[in-house]
């Protein structure tokens, strides 16, 4: 009995000694590897050059990250500002150096040379096809035109909000909208949209799926169409695909690095009437004007206040879309 107990104790002690030896050996090996690795890094670092590559997020993407400190003072020192204006403005001003003048005026407000870009567009309808909002902050000057109220409203809805879109193959599939945030957006030189709602047996409601002439025409020869149909109902869609593209889109929320300044007009376009705009708030500003020089002077004068209520390349579901009016 005594011999068995001694053997057990000796076996336990030998195991402890062996385990301790193994742990010490592993520690020395790890120290050797780590120190050698650090030595190689330190030795080679003066001879290596590396670049940190980031992800280039699209302007229409839903992955934009909010900048917490975007409202701090002097944010324009490291930011870019795009000011979009119609061709009419440059025609009326008729001065070959007017852009240089505007740049110098922006400099007095703290925007350094090279940070402000003046971009011209022909008209609202052509601008709506491809806005190209590339800057950290984008301000669009949009002159009020009573005949283009619907186009102005749709353009505002398009660029003041984030959209997640997928192409639609209308030749093969039926489509339905799931909720109020789900819209069909068409863009092109000429978009004519016709729809035929279907019942549960995929038969047309008030139309024949085999006869496009019986479809309901919801848009005719437009450049931008944001179309809303009855939710939860399949539709057969007909579109002039040769001159127009159509996408199934979901409104994600306001795009806070874009502002629209409505120039003139007795009416103010209210895009907050759309139930998908939450909360139901709009920020507006208004002044009297007669010349485009007055418009640009006002924009320069108020630019820092405008930018302070925007967010640099961000999207927030807790803030409203920004719509300004001169």
From Swiss-Prot:
Stated name of the protein = Outer capsid glycoprotein VP7
* Molecular function GO terms recorded: metal ion binding
* Cleavable signal peptide: 1-50
- Any S-S bridges, and between which cysteines? 82-135, 165-249, 191-244, 196-207
| Post-translational changes noted in the entry | N-glycosylated.
Q: How does it assemble?
A: Homotrimer; disulfide-linked. 2 Ca(2+) ions bound at each subunit interface in the trimer hold the trimer together. Interacts with the intermediate capsid protein VP6. Interacts with the outer capsid protein VP5*.
Q: Where is region (CNP motif) located?
A: 165-167
Other observations noted: Some rotavirus strains are neuraminidase-sensitive and require sialic acid to attach to the cell surface. Some rotavirus strains are integrin-dependent. Some rotavirus strains depend on ganglioside for their entry into the host cell. Hsp70 also seems to be involved in the entry of some strains. In group A rotaviruses, VP7 defines the G serotype.
Pfam (any one): VP7
User: Which of this chain's residues are annotated to bind Ca(2+) 1?
Assistant: 95, 206, 214, 216
């Amino acid at each position: 009995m005594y011999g068995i107990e001694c053997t057990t104790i000796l076996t336990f002690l030998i195991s402890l000694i062996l385990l301790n030896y193994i742990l010490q050996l592993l520690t020395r090996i790890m120290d050797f590897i780590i120190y050698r690795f650090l030595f190689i890094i330190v030795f080679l670092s003066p001879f290596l050059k590396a670049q940190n590559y980031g992800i280039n997020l699209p302007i229409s993407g839903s992955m934009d990250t909010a900048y917490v400190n975007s409202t701090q003072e002097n944010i324009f020192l490291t930011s870019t500002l795009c000011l979009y204006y119609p061709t009419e403005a440059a025609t009326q001003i008729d001065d070959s150096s007017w852009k240089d003048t505007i740049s110098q005026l922006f400099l007095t407000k703290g925007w350094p040379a090279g940070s402000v870009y003046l971009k011209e567009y022909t008209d609202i309808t052509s601008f709506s096809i491809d806005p190209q909002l590339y800057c950290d902050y984008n301000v669009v000057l949009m002159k009020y035109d009573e005949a283009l109220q619907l186009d102005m409203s749709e353009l505002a809805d398009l660029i003041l909000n984030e959209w997640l879109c997928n192409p639609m193959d209308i030749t093969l599939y039926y489509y339905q909208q799931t909720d109020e945030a789900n819209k069909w957006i068409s863009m092109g030189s000429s978009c004519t949209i016709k729809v035929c709602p279907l019942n549960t047996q995929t038969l047309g409601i008030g139309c024949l799926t085999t006869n496009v002439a019986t479809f309901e025409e919801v848009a005719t020869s437009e450049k931008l169409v944001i179309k809303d149909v009855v939710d939860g109902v399949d539709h057969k869609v007909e579109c002039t695909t040769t001159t127009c593209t159509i996408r199934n889109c979901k409104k994600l929320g306001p795009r806070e690095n874009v502002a629209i300044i409505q120039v003139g007009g007795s009416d103010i376009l209210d895009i907050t009437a759309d139930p998908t705009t939450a909360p139901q708030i709009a920020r507006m500003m208004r002044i009297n004007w007669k010349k485009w020089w007055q418009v640009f002077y006002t924009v320069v004068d108020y630019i820092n206040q405008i930018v302070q209520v925007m967010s640099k390349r961000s999207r927030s579901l807790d803030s409203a879309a920004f719509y300004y009016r001169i």
